[in-house]
Amino acid sequence: MAAFTQIVEQASDILWNYLLLFLLVGTGIFFTIKLHFVQLSSFADGVRHLFKGFSLHGKAADKDGMSSFQALATAIAAQVGTGNITGCATALVSGGPGALFWTWVSAFFGMATIYAEAVLAQTYRTTVDGQVTGGPAYYIRAAFKGKFGKFLATFFSVALILALGFMGNMVQSNSIGDAFHNAFGVNRVVVGVVIAVLAAFIFLGGVKRIAAVTEKLVPIMALFYIIGCAIILVMNASAIPNAFVQIFTLAFQPQAIAGGVAGVTVQQAMRYGVARGLFSNEAGLGSTPHAHALAKVKQPQDQGALAIIGVFVDTFVILTLTALVLITSGLIPEGMTGTALTQAAFSLMFGSFGKVFIAICMLFFAFSTILGWYFFGQVNFNALFGSKYTKVYSLIVVLFILIGSSLKVDLVWALADFFNGLMAVPNLLALLALSGVVAGIARNKKD
Protein backbone atom coordinates (compact mmCIF):
# COMPACT_ATOMS: atom_id res chain seq x y z
CA MET A 1 0.00 0.00 0.00
CA ALA A 2 2.87 2.36 0.80
CA ALA A 3 4.37 1.77 -2.64
CA PHE A 4 1.04 2.48 -4.35
CA THR A 5 0.63 5.65 -2.29
CA GLN A 6 4.09 6.79 -3.42
CA ILE A 7 3.19 6.15 -7.07
CA VAL A 8 -0.01 8.17 -6.76
CA GLU A 9 1.84 11.01 -5.00
CA GLN A 10 4.48 11.10 -7.75
CA ALA A 11 1.81 11.14 -10.46
CA SER A 12 0.01 13.93 -8.61
CA ASP A 13 3.24 15.92 -8.27
CA ILE A 14 3.91 15.64 -12.01
CA LEU A 15 0.33 16.69 -12.83
CA TRP A 16 0.40 19.70 -10.51
CA ASN A 17 4.01 20.86 -10.83
CA TYR A 18 4.46 20.49 -14.58
CA LEU A 19 0.98 21.13 -15.99
CA LEU A 20 -1.66 22.55 -13.70
CA LEU A 21 0.32 25.30 -11.98
CA PHE A 22 1.15 26.79 -15.38
CA LEU A 23 -2.31 26.12 -16.84
CA LEU A 24 -4.17 27.58 -13.85
CA VAL A 25 -2.00 30.68 -13.52
CA GLY A 26 -1.87 31.11 -17.29
CA THR A 27 -5.66 30.94 -17.52
CA GLY A 28 -5.93 33.54 -14.77
CA ILE A 29 -3.53 35.89 -16.55
CA PHE A 30 -5.39 35.34 -19.84
CA PHE A 31 -8.78 36.26 -18.35
CA THR A 32 -7.29 39.18 -16.42
CA ILE A 33 -6.13 40.69 -19.72
CA LYS A 34 -9.16 39.67 -21.79
CA LEU A 35 -11.63 40.98 -19.20
CA HIS A 36 -9.60 44.16 -18.54
CA PHE A 37 -8.75 43.39 -14.90
CA VAL A 38 -12.29 42.41 -13.99
CA GLN A 39 -11.15 41.50 -10.47
CA LEU A 40 -10.59 45.21 -9.87
CA SER A 41 -13.44 46.72 -11.89
CA SER A 42 -16.07 44.35 -10.44
CA PHE A 43 -14.79 44.20 -6.86
CA ALA A 44 -16.99 47.06 -5.62
CA ASP A 45 -20.03 45.44 -7.26
CA GLY A 46 -19.22 42.22 -5.45
CA VAL A 47 -19.02 43.99 -2.09
CA ARG A 48 -22.33 45.76 -2.80
CA HIS A 49 -24.07 42.47 -3.63
CA LEU A 50 -22.53 40.89 -0.54
CA PHE A 51 -23.96 43.48 1.85
CA LYS A 52 -27.26 43.43 -0.02
CA GLY A 53 -27.38 39.68 0.61
CA PHE A 54 -26.72 40.25 4.31
CA SER A 55 -29.57 42.74 4.58
CA LEU A 56 -32.08 40.65 2.63
CA HIS A 57 -31.36 37.34 4.41
CA GLY A 58 -32.26 35.53 1.13
CA LYS A 59 -35.35 33.45 0.73
CA ALA A 60 -35.15 29.71 1.31
CA ALA A 61 -33.58 27.83 -1.58
CA ASP A 62 -36.01 25.91 -3.75
CA LYS A 63 -36.21 24.09 -7.07
CA ASP A 64 -35.62 27.40 -8.86
CA GLY A 65 -32.28 27.96 -7.13
CA MET A 66 -31.02 29.95 -4.16
CA SER A 67 -30.23 33.55 -3.30
CA SER A 68 -26.95 34.99 -4.55
CA PHE A 69 -25.66 35.20 -0.97
CA GLN A 70 -26.56 31.56 -0.28
CA ALA A 71 -24.69 30.57 -3.44
CA LEU A 72 -21.64 32.55 -2.32
CA ALA A 73 -21.87 31.08 1.20
CA THR A 74 -22.02 27.55 -0.23
CA ALA A 75 -19.00 28.29 -2.43
CA ILE A 76 -17.02 29.78 0.47
CA ALA A 77 -18.04 26.82 2.64
CA ALA A 78 -16.10 24.63 0.22
CA GLN A 79 -13.23 27.08 -0.31
CA VAL A 80 -12.50 27.81 3.36
CA GLY A 81 -11.41 24.40 4.60
CA THR A 82 -8.69 22.80 6.66
CA GLY A 83 -6.17 23.93 4.04
CA ASN A 84 -6.49 27.46 5.42
CA ILE A 85 -5.07 26.10 8.69
CA THR A 86 -2.87 23.11 7.87
CA GLY A 87 -2.05 23.85 4.23
CA CYS A 88 -0.92 27.38 4.99
CA ALA A 89 1.50 26.09 7.63
CA THR A 90 2.92 23.50 5.24
CA ALA A 91 3.41 26.11 2.50
CA LEU A 92 5.31 28.44 4.83
CA VAL A 93 7.57 25.66 6.10
CA SER A 94 8.30 24.39 2.57
CA GLY A 95 8.48 27.73 0.76
CA GLY A 96 9.36 30.21 3.49
CA PRO A 97 7.47 33.44 4.31
CA GLY A 98 7.92 34.56 0.70
CA ALA A 99 5.45 31.86 -0.35
CA LEU A 100 2.62 34.07 0.91
CA PHE A 101 3.46 36.71 -1.69
CA TRP A 102 3.08 34.16 -4.48
CA THR A 103 -0.16 32.95 -2.89
CA TRP A 104 -1.47 36.50 -3.27
CA VAL A 105 -0.31 36.61 -6.89
CA SER A 106 -2.06 33.36 -7.80
CA ALA A 107 -5.22 34.46 -5.96
CA PHE A 108 -5.27 37.81 -7.77
CA PHE A 109 -5.26 36.12 -11.17
CA GLY A 110 -7.56 33.40 -9.86
CA MET A 111 -10.21 36.05 -9.25
CA ALA A 112 -10.52 36.56 -13.01
CA THR A 113 -10.77 32.80 -13.56
CA ILE A 114 -13.49 32.32 -10.97
CA TYR A 115 -15.42 35.25 -12.46
CA ALA A 116 -15.43 33.39 -15.78
CA GLU A 117 -16.51 30.17 -14.06
CA ALA A 118 -19.45 31.82 -12.32
CA VAL A 119 -20.59 33.67 -15.45
CA LEU A 120 -20.53 30.49 -17.54
CA ALA A 121 -22.26 28.48 -14.80
CA GLN A 122 -25.08 31.04 -14.82
CA THR A 123 -25.22 31.22 -18.62
CA TYR A 124 -25.40 27.47 -19.26
CA ARG A 125 -27.44 26.36 -16.26
CA THR A 126 -30.50 24.26 -17.01
CA THR A 127 -33.47 22.52 -15.38
CA VAL A 128 -33.40 18.76 -14.78
CA ASP A 129 -36.36 16.96 -13.19
CA GLY A 130 -37.82 20.33 -12.20
CA GLN A 131 -34.65 21.45 -10.38
CA VAL A 132 -32.33 24.22 -11.58
CA THR A 133 -28.79 22.90 -11.89
CA GLY A 134 -25.51 23.76 -13.55
CA GLY A 135 -21.74 23.63 -13.40
CA PRO A 136 -18.72 22.80 -15.56
CA ALA A 137 -20.23 19.55 -16.88
CA TYR A 138 -22.88 21.66 -18.60
CA TYR A 139 -20.66 24.37 -20.07
CA ILE A 140 -18.06 21.79 -21.11
CA ARG A 141 -20.72 20.26 -23.38
CA ALA A 142 -21.41 23.73 -24.78
CA ALA A 143 -17.71 24.32 -25.44
CA PHE A 144 -17.05 21.00 -27.15
CA LYS A 145 -19.84 19.51 -29.20
CA GLY A 146 -20.53 15.87 -29.94
CA LYS A 147 -18.90 12.82 -28.39
CA PHE A 148 -15.76 14.67 -27.34
CA GLY A 149 -17.74 17.17 -25.30
CA LYS A 150 -19.79 14.41 -23.70
CA PHE A 151 -16.60 12.49 -22.86
CA LEU A 152 -14.93 15.52 -21.25
CA ALA A 153 -18.06 16.34 -19.25
CA THR A 154 -18.35 12.75 -18.02
CA PHE A 155 -14.63 12.66 -17.22
CA PHE A 156 -15.00 15.85 -15.18
CA SER A 157 -18.02 14.56 -13.27
CA VAL A 158 -16.39 11.24 -12.36
CA ALA A 159 -13.17 12.96 -11.24
CA LEU A 160 -15.08 15.46 -9.10
CA ILE A 161 -17.24 12.81 -7.42
CA LEU A 162 -14.13 10.84 -6.50
CA ALA A 163 -11.98 13.84 -5.51
CA LEU A 164 -14.51 15.81 -3.50
CA GLY A 165 -17.67 13.82 -2.83
CA PHE A 166 -15.95 10.64 -1.67
CA MET A 167 -12.23 10.93 -0.85
CA GLY A 168 -12.20 14.64 -0.14
CA ASN A 169 -14.95 14.35 2.46
CA MET A 170 -13.15 11.37 3.98
CA VAL A 171 -10.11 13.57 4.55
CA GLN A 172 -12.19 16.40 6.03
CA SER A 173 -13.75 13.98 8.51
CA ASN A 174 -10.29 12.73 9.42
CA SER A 175 -9.14 16.30 10.12
CA ILE A 176 -12.04 16.84 12.53
CA GLY A 177 -11.36 13.51 14.24
CA ASP A 178 -7.67 14.32 14.72
CA ALA A 179 -8.34 17.83 16.00
CA PHE A 180 -10.88 16.74 18.62
CA HIS A 181 -8.82 13.74 19.69
CA ASN A 182 -5.74 15.93 20.22
CA ALA A 183 -7.61 18.75 21.96
CA PHE A 184 -10.11 16.82 24.10
CA GLY A 185 -9.04 13.16 23.95
CA VAL A 186 -12.33 12.21 22.29
CA ASN A 187 -12.39 8.87 20.47
CA ARG A 188 -12.12 9.45 16.73
CA VAL A 189 -14.89 6.94 15.98
CA VAL A 190 -17.29 8.84 18.24
CA VAL A 191 -16.42 12.06 16.42
CA GLY A 192 -17.03 10.31 13.10
CA VAL A 193 -20.46 9.07 14.17
CA VAL A 194 -21.55 12.54 15.30
CA ILE A 195 -20.30 14.21 12.12
CA ALA A 196 -21.88 11.51 9.92
CA VAL A 197 -25.28 11.86 11.64
CA LEU A 198 -25.24 15.67 11.37
CA ALA A 199 -24.16 15.49 7.74
CA ALA A 200 -26.84 12.91 6.89
CA PHE A 201 -29.54 15.11 8.42
CA ILE A 202 -28.46 18.07 6.29
CA PHE A 203 -27.94 15.98 3.14
CA LEU A 204 -31.48 14.58 3.33
CA GLY A 205 -32.86 18.12 3.39
CA GLY A 206 -31.44 18.70 -0.07
CA VAL A 207 -30.18 21.98 -1.47
CA LYS A 208 -32.69 23.93 0.63
CA ARG A 209 -31.18 22.71 3.92
CA ILE A 210 -27.57 22.91 2.69
CA ALA A 211 -28.06 26.54 1.63
CA ALA A 212 -29.81 27.41 4.91
CA VAL A 213 -26.95 25.95 6.97
CA THR A 214 -24.07 27.44 4.97
CA GLU A 215 -25.78 30.84 4.89
CA LYS A 216 -25.58 30.94 8.70
CA LEU A 217 -22.45 28.87 9.33
CA VAL A 218 -20.01 30.63 6.99
CA PRO A 219 -20.30 34.15 8.47
CA ILE A 220 -20.10 32.76 12.02
CA MET A 221 -17.04 30.59 11.41
CA ALA A 222 -15.24 33.30 9.43
CA LEU A 223 -15.87 35.93 12.11
CA PHE A 224 -14.84 33.56 14.93
CA TYR A 225 -11.52 32.75 13.24
CA ILE A 226 -10.81 36.33 12.17
CA ILE A 227 -11.36 37.60 15.73
CA GLY A 228 -9.03 34.93 17.13
CA CYS A 229 -6.28 35.81 14.65
CA ALA A 230 -6.80 39.54 15.19
CA ILE A 231 -6.37 39.17 18.97
CA ILE A 232 -3.04 37.38 18.49
CA LEU A 233 -1.80 39.91 15.94
CA VAL A 234 -2.74 42.84 18.19
CA MET A 235 -0.84 41.20 21.07
CA ASN A 236 2.10 40.60 18.72
CA ALA A 237 1.82 43.88 16.77
CA SER A 238 5.50 44.75 17.05
CA ALA A 239 6.41 41.71 14.92
CA ILE A 240 4.02 42.51 12.06
CA PRO A 241 6.23 45.02 10.16
CA ASN A 242 9.10 42.52 10.06
CA ALA A 243 6.68 39.82 8.90
CA PHE A 244 5.78 41.91 5.84
CA VAL A 245 9.46 42.62 5.20
CA GLN A 246 10.08 38.86 5.15
CA ILE A 247 7.07 38.19 2.91
CA PHE A 248 8.12 40.67 0.21
CA THR A 249 11.89 40.24 0.50
CA LEU A 250 12.02 36.46 0.63
CA ALA A 251 9.71 36.12 -2.36
CA PHE A 252 12.66 37.28 -4.51
CA GLN A 253 15.83 36.95 -2.41
CA PRO A 254 16.22 33.47 -0.95
CA GLN A 255 19.73 34.24 0.26
CA ALA A 256 18.25 36.79 2.66
CA ILE A 257 15.99 34.26 4.40
CA ALA A 258 15.94 34.88 8.12
CA GLY A 259 14.88 32.81 11.10
CA GLY A 260 16.74 29.68 10.09
CA VAL A 261 14.66 28.63 7.10
CA ALA A 262 17.74 27.87 5.05
CA GLY A 263 17.87 26.35 1.61
CA VAL A 264 14.51 27.64 0.37
CA THR A 265 14.85 28.90 -3.19
CA VAL A 266 12.74 31.44 -5.06
CA GLN A 267 11.38 28.56 -7.13
CA GLN A 268 10.23 26.77 -3.99
CA ALA A 269 8.60 29.92 -2.65
CA MET A 270 6.76 30.35 -5.95
CA ARG A 271 5.77 26.71 -6.24
CA TYR A 272 4.39 26.28 -2.74
CA GLY A 273 2.84 29.74 -2.64
CA VAL A 274 1.05 29.42 -5.97
CA ALA A 275 -0.09 25.86 -5.22
CA ARG A 276 -1.42 26.86 -1.79
CA GLY A 277 -3.41 29.71 -3.29
CA LEU A 278 -4.93 27.51 -5.97
CA PHE A 279 -5.74 24.68 -3.56
CA SER A 280 -7.27 27.10 -1.08
CA ASN A 281 -9.58 29.23 -3.22
CA GLU A 282 -10.28 26.53 -5.85
CA ALA A 283 -10.33 29.08 -8.69
CA GLY A 284 -10.20 27.15 -11.96
CA LEU A 285 -10.70 23.72 -10.42
CA GLY A 286 -14.38 23.62 -11.39
CA SER A 287 -15.90 23.16 -7.93
CA THR A 288 -17.57 26.44 -6.95
CA PRO A 289 -19.47 26.99 -10.26
CA HIS A 290 -22.02 24.41 -9.07
CA ALA A 291 -23.11 26.80 -6.32
CA HIS A 292 -22.93 29.96 -8.43
CA ALA A 293 -25.09 28.33 -11.13
CA LEU A 294 -28.07 28.22 -8.76
CA ALA A 295 -28.00 31.89 -7.73
CA LYS A 296 -31.10 33.93 -8.51
CA VAL A 297 -29.54 37.03 -10.04
CA LYS A 298 -30.57 39.56 -12.67
CA GLN A 299 -27.50 38.91 -14.81
CA PRO A 300 -24.55 36.47 -14.76
CA GLN A 301 -22.07 39.30 -14.17
CA ASP A 302 -23.55 39.90 -10.71
CA GLN A 303 -22.69 36.40 -9.54
CA GLY A 304 -19.29 36.68 -11.19
CA ALA A 305 -18.58 39.72 -9.03
CA LEU A 306 -19.66 37.83 -5.91
CA ALA A 307 -17.42 34.90 -6.85
CA ILE A 308 -14.47 37.32 -6.81
CA ILE A 309 -15.32 38.19 -3.20
CA GLY A 310 -15.18 34.48 -2.35
CA VAL A 311 -11.53 34.28 -3.40
CA PHE A 312 -10.77 37.50 -1.55
CA VAL A 313 -12.28 36.25 1.73
CA ASP A 314 -10.61 32.85 1.45
CA THR A 315 -7.09 33.92 0.49
CA PHE A 316 -6.55 37.61 1.18
CA VAL A 317 -8.34 37.53 4.54
CA ILE A 318 -8.46 34.10 6.22
CA LEU A 319 -5.34 32.45 4.77
CA THR A 320 -3.33 35.67 5.12
CA LEU A 321 -4.30 36.03 8.79
CA THR A 322 -3.18 32.45 9.42
CA ALA A 323 0.14 33.14 7.70
CA LEU A 324 0.75 36.31 9.71
CA VAL A 325 0.03 34.50 12.99
CA LEU A 326 2.53 31.79 12.01
CA ILE A 327 5.26 34.15 10.78
CA THR A 328 5.05 36.46 13.80
CA SER A 329 5.13 33.46 16.16
CA GLY A 330 8.72 32.65 15.14
CA LEU A 331 7.92 28.93 15.22
CA ILE A 332 8.35 28.12 11.52
CA PRO A 333 12.02 27.05 11.91
CA GLU A 334 11.18 24.69 14.79
CA GLY A 335 10.52 21.70 12.54
CA MET A 336 6.76 21.50 13.03
CA THR A 337 4.27 21.60 10.20
CA GLY A 338 0.55 21.37 9.47
CA THR A 339 -1.93 21.42 12.34
CA ALA A 340 0.81 20.99 14.97
CA LEU A 341 2.52 24.23 13.91
CA THR A 342 -0.75 26.18 13.84
CA GLN A 343 -1.80 24.85 17.25
CA ALA A 344 1.60 25.75 18.70
CA ALA A 345 1.40 29.29 17.29
CA PHE A 346 -2.05 29.87 18.78
CA SER A 347 -1.02 28.26 22.08
CA LEU A 348 1.80 30.81 22.46
CA MET A 349 -0.81 33.49 23.06
CA PHE A 350 -3.89 31.54 24.13
CA GLY A 351 -2.16 28.91 26.27
CA SER A 352 -3.97 25.58 26.47
CA PHE A 353 -7.00 27.20 24.82
CA GLY A 354 -4.96 27.41 21.60
CA LYS A 355 -5.55 23.73 20.83
CA VAL A 356 -9.23 24.08 21.68
CA PHE A 357 -9.56 27.14 19.44
CA ILE A 358 -7.98 25.35 16.47
CA ALA A 359 -10.12 22.23 17.10
CA ILE A 360 -13.29 24.34 16.99
CA CYS A 361 -12.12 26.11 13.83
CA MET A 362 -11.22 22.77 12.22
CA LEU A 363 -14.76 21.57 13.00
CA PHE A 364 -16.31 24.64 11.39
CA PHE A 365 -14.00 24.72 8.37
CA ALA A 366 -13.99 20.99 7.65
CA PHE A 367 -17.72 20.48 8.20
CA SER A 368 -18.62 23.41 5.96
CA THR A 369 -16.33 21.96 3.30
CA ILE A 370 -18.09 18.59 3.64
CA LEU A 371 -21.41 20.30 2.90
CA GLY A 372 -20.05 22.19 -0.10
CA TRP A 373 -18.21 19.23 -1.58
CA TYR A 374 -21.17 16.92 -1.02
CA PHE A 375 -23.38 19.30 -2.97
CA PHE A 376 -20.90 19.66 -5.83
CA GLY A 377 -20.63 15.88 -6.03
CA GLN A 378 -24.40 15.48 -5.94
CA VAL A 379 -24.86 17.75 -8.96
CA ASN A 380 -22.48 15.59 -10.99
CA PHE A 381 -23.82 12.29 -9.64
CA ASN A 382 -27.31 13.34 -10.71
CA ALA A 383 -25.98 14.42 -14.11
CA LEU A 384 -24.58 10.91 -14.64
CA PHE A 385 -27.23 8.71 -13.03
CA GLY A 386 -30.34 10.83 -12.49
CA SER A 387 -31.82 12.39 -9.36
CA LYS A 388 -33.67 9.21 -8.36
CA TYR A 389 -30.36 7.80 -7.06
CA THR A 390 -29.46 10.85 -4.93
CA LYS A 391 -30.04 8.96 -1.67
CA VAL A 392 -27.58 6.29 -2.80
CA TYR A 393 -24.95 8.98 -3.27
CA SER A 394 -25.81 10.48 0.13
CA LEU A 395 -25.39 7.11 1.83
CA ILE A 396 -21.99 6.51 0.21
CA VAL A 397 -20.73 9.94 1.30
CA VAL A 398 -21.96 9.38 4.88
CA LEU A 399 -20.10 6.05 4.97
CA PHE A 400 -16.90 7.71 3.74
CA ILE A 401 -17.27 10.39 6.44
CA LEU A 402 -17.72 7.72 9.10
CA ILE A 403 -14.76 5.63 7.92
CA GLY A 404 -12.49 8.60 7.33
CA SER A 405 -12.69 9.92 10.88
CA SER A 406 -10.46 7.19 12.31
CA LEU A 407 -8.31 5.89 9.45
CA LYS A 408 -4.87 6.91 8.28
CA VAL A 409 -5.66 8.66 5.02
CA ASP A 410 -2.31 9.25 3.28
CA LEU A 411 -3.44 7.31 0.20
CA VAL A 412 -6.84 9.02 0.22
CA TRP A 413 -5.15 12.45 0.34
CA ALA A 414 -2.93 11.48 -2.59
CA LEU A 415 -5.87 10.20 -4.64
CA ALA A 416 -7.97 13.27 -3.81
CA ASP A 417 -5.16 15.58 -4.98
CA PHE A 418 -4.70 13.55 -8.17
CA PHE A 419 -8.39 13.50 -9.14
CA ASN A 420 -8.68 17.16 -8.13
CA GLY A 421 -6.05 17.90 -10.73
CA LEU A 422 -7.73 15.72 -13.35
CA MET A 423 -11.07 17.49 -12.98
CA ALA A 424 -9.41 20.89 -13.46
CA VAL A 425 -8.10 20.07 -16.94
CA PRO A 426 -11.43 19.81 -18.85
CA ASN A 427 -12.79 22.75 -16.86
CA LEU A 428 -9.90 25.00 -17.87
CA LEU A 429 -10.09 23.88 -21.50
CA ALA A 430 -13.79 24.79 -21.55
CA LEU A 431 -13.14 28.17 -19.93
CA LEU A 432 -10.59 29.03 -22.60
CA ALA A 433 -12.82 27.75 -25.41
CA LEU A 434 -15.72 29.90 -24.15
CA SER A 435 -13.61 32.96 -23.31
CA GLY A 436 -15.30 34.93 -26.08
CA VAL A 437 -18.69 34.24 -24.53
CA VAL A 438 -17.45 35.43 -21.13
CA ALA A 439 -15.97 38.60 -22.62
CA GLY A 440 -19.19 39.36 -24.49
CA ILE A 441 -21.30 38.97 -21.36
CA ALA A 442 -18.88 41.07 -19.31
CA ARG A 443 -19.10 43.91 -21.87
CA ASN A 444 -22.91 43.93 -21.72
CA LYS A 445 -23.10 44.41 -17.95
CA LYS A 446 -26.04 46.55 -16.80
CA ASP A 447 -25.90 48.65 -13.63
Residue ranges and their predicted role:
Residues 1-78, 82, 93-98, 110, ...:
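N-terminal alpha-helical transmembrane segments of multi-pass membrane transport
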Residues 3-4, 34-39, 83-88, 165-176, ...:
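Transmembrane helix-loop junctions in multi-pass membrane proteins
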Residues 23-30, 35-47, 156, 173-180, ...:
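Membrane-interface loop-to-helix entry segments
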Residues 31-32, 106-130, 141-174, 178-203, ...:
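Helix-loop-helix module between adjacent transmembrane segments
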Residues 50-72, 107, 118, 122-163, ...:
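Transmembrane-helix boundary/entry motifs in multi-pass membrane transporters
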Residues 56-94, 120-123, 128-143, 155-161, ...:
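Alpha-helical membrane segments and immediately flanking helix-loop junctions
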Residues 109-117, 193-207, 218-238, 271, ...:
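Selective recognition of specific alpha-helical transmembrane segments in multi-pass small-molecule
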Residues 115-129, 230-246, 254-261, 294-297, ...:
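Extracellular/periplasmic helix-exit of transmembrane alpha-helices
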